Regions:
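Sec/Tat signal peptide C-region and signal peptidase I cleavage site
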Residues: 16-20
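Positively charged n-region of N-terminal signal peptides that target proteins for export
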Residues: 1-5
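Bacterial N-terminal signal peptides
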Residues: 7-15
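Active-site/ligand-binding surface loops and adjacent short beta/alpha elements
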Residues: 118-177
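Acidic, serine/threonine-rich low-complexity disordered tracts
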Residues: 21-118, 161-267
Length: 267
């Protein structure tokens, strides 16, 4: 699977709009990741937890969001994944000031850290693959530039009643040494059945990760995402086609929500 797609799934199933108020200390969202193909109908292969707590960074209060994805025990003999993603978000303006990742996938290891300098419009990134020397880079970003985890929360804040069916918007996603673009289009409202959870009123979006050229989406990665049509606006389902079959992630448990779960229409 495309590594950027796996990053997005973990970040999603692991923001610049201050009025959204979507960071909620104590919120825990748990997901199951499954693989579907002709000979493997809906095989659950991994779990993802996204937790929000309070922390301190630079002497100021921050929301700390930790997204962790691991393969289920039955599949660890085949391929082991234990990935963690973190962001620190200023509680006063909801701007991300730091991102970190710690990735273990089989024999592959990867660590990264992004430090945002919003005043100068740059992000300072450093990363290390396996035992190779650490690399670093400083990149210009716009006000909408962010890491995948912050982008996930920003998409939640963007999913508002202001959207019109067919309308597209674009966000910038920082990935180590480059900036990729995420274009998302509002498909419409849909009642979505989630395994073992029930039926939800949702907002459906079609998303595409562009190339490093910025505005070319012809060979990017596509996925669809369903977000609750209530004030919580958290993803309940994500699906992306791959060469053989598809990968999907769906909510399995949610606790500590800020608002009532009014989108759940039937268990």
């Amino acid at each position: 699977m495309n590594r950027y797609l796996w990053t997005m799934i973990l970040a999603f199933t692991v923001s610049l709009t201050a009025s959204a108020q979507l960071y909620q200390p104590g919120e825990v969202l748990s997901y199951r990741v499954s693989y579907k193909a002709r000979l493997f109908p809906n095989t659950e292969v991994a779990t993802v937890d996204v937790r929000t707590t309070l922390d301190t960074l630079y002497g100021r209060p921050h929301y700390k969001v930790h997204g962790r994805g691991v393969t289920m025990p039955a599949y660890r003999w085949f391929f082991t994944v234990d990935d963690s993603y973190y962001i620190w978000v200023d509680t006063l303006n909801n701007r991300t000031n730091r991102f970190a990742s710690d990735i273990h996938e089989g024999s592959y290891t990867f660590r990264s850290e992004y430090l945002y300098d919003r005043a100068n419009g740059v992000v300072n990134t450093r990363w290390q693959k396996k035992q190779l020397p650490e690399r670093s880079k400083t990149m210009q970003i716009s006000e909408r530039g962010m890491d995948p985890v912050s982008l996930y929360f920003n998409l939640r804040s963007e999913a508002s009643n202001s959207f019109r069916e067919g309308e597209s918007r674009r966000l910038e996603m920082v990935l180590e040494d480059t900036v990729r673009y995420l274009e998302f289009r509002f498909v419409g409202r849909e009642v979505k059945r989630i395994p073992k959870m029930g039926k939800f009123r949702t907002l459906k979006f079609k998303c595409q990760i562009g190339t490093s050229d910025g505005f070319s989406f012809t060979d990017g990665t596509e996925f669809s995402i369903w977000i609750t049509d209530d004030d919580n606006k958290f993803p309940v389902y994500l699906e992306s086609p791959i060469r053989i079959g598809s990968i999907c992630a769906y909510i399995s448990k949610c606790t500590g929500l800020k608002y009532p779960l009014e989108s759940l229409v039937k268990r």
